[in-house]
UniProtKB/Swiss-Prot annotation:
Upper classification of the organism: Bacteria, Bacillati, Mycoplasmatota, Mycoplasmoidales, Mycoplasmoidaceae
GO CC, alphabetical: cytoplasm
The species this protein was found in: Mycoplasma pneumoniae (strain ATCC 29342 / M129 / Subtype 1) (Mycoplasmoides pneumoniae)
Family annotation (InterPro entries): Class_I_gatase-like (IPR029062), DJ-1/PfpI (IPR002818), Prot/Nucl_acid_deglycase (IPR050325)
Record protein name field: Uncharacterized protein MG029 homolog
């Protein structure tokens, strides 16, 4: 089974997060773990999505890749969060999958 870390952050795009998570849910060989190091609840930019099953401690070596939804929060929040950027950098530096949508690649 493959394991994917899903980084969430305030003002991420609701549609990009929810639609992608629905697709991931159809993949029986994929386990997703929702992650933010400091927040227990994250609200999407449109106020439609409220994520509250967030893990704050993970062993990055256990994951095959990372997914980061986009949206306005990418440049407002993610771009200034060194801990999250270091987490994403780990996947790049270890030749693991990095999936990013919309504005997130601009931050990376």
């Amino acid at each position: 089974m493959k394991k994917l870390l899903v980084i969430v952050y305030p003002d991420m795009n609701d549609v990009e997060y929810t639609n992608t998570m629905v697709v991931f849910g159809f993949v029986k060989e994929l386990q997703t773990v929702i992650y933010h190091p400091n927040l227990s609840t994250v609200k999407g930019s449109n106020g439609v999505t409220l994520v509250n099953q967030i893990t704050s401690k993970v062993n990055l070596e256990e994951f095959d890749g990372v997914f980061i939804p986009g949206g306005m929060g990418a440049t407002k929040v993610l771009d200034h969060d060194q801990q999250l950027l270091d987490t994403i950098r780990y996947f790049k530096d270890h030749d693991k999958y990095v999936f990013a949508i919309c504005d997130t690649p601009n931050v990376l």
